[in-house]
Amino acid sequence: MIDISIIIVNYNVKEYIVDCIQSIIRWTPETIQYEIIVVDNNSQDGSVNALETKFPEITILKNKNNIGFTRAINQGANIANGAYLFLLNPDTLFLEDSMTTLYSFLERNRHVGIVGPKLISTDENIQQSYWKYPTLISSLLSIYHLDFLNNNKNHAHYDKSNYLSVDAISGGAFFLAKNLFNDLNGFNDNLFWMEDMDFCKRASTLGHKIAYLPNTKLIHYIGKSSEKNWVVTISNRLLSKIKYFKLHHGSSEVMTLITAIYLLVVVKCAYLLFLSPFSSVYRKKFIGYLTTLKLLLNKQYQIGL
């Protein structure tokens, strides 16, 4: 009987995912029966060969193209044998036996549907590991890089030993029962971003609590897969925000958000075009925002696209 299925989506982060899996093996005790499922989104950095060589016991699903995080997670969950799922980013690192802590917590607290640990950076700064549901105001402040004015952000430094009931936790380390995942038909594959927020919101409507557990921690290097492809990252973030609002907010708020994102993308295209001769990163970001503008004009924010 498998207790936990750990599902990791990989895209060209060989140097991180190898360390991640090694840390899982090092810190997870023999008393917990687990399996590791890696869903590879057509990495070209030798990730699959490295994983097959170092960890022949793990399961690797090899996609012929990059199908995104959300669909890859669902793909891994479909073959998972564990009673629980631990959805884990490849750029995370175990520092202790977090597996037992999270597993035992859900076993003891059946009213809680999803739990996540504290995520820290390599210099031990506490990262934002949970959120409040986005409002129109908080979303506008976020997309215009005015988060310092945002009262809707979490209290990142909550560091008590007991758990904190929150709206949503980070999909970077997302622990839940497989039955709950199945009951909600997995992550919404219309969303390439904010899938964790959407899932938590749907779970809460069924009466499940969402918990942040600060007494166990993982290192999270943040966004190492997304940095590999700015075009996909930029468009997914902005279009998924619109899709989330279409799912959970009224039409007037949706139209306000779409207008604000249009303005943002046009301004970003203009100044990144000016800066692009000076840096390859600026050039990649310019292409990302230009691609996003084309997708907006084609209304690729509709649900089902």
Language-model features: locations:
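A short, conserved alpha-helix in the catalytic core of glycosyltransferases
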Residues: 161, 167-186, 190-217
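Conserved donor NDP-sugar-binding/catalytic core segment of glycosyltransferases
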Residues: 93-129
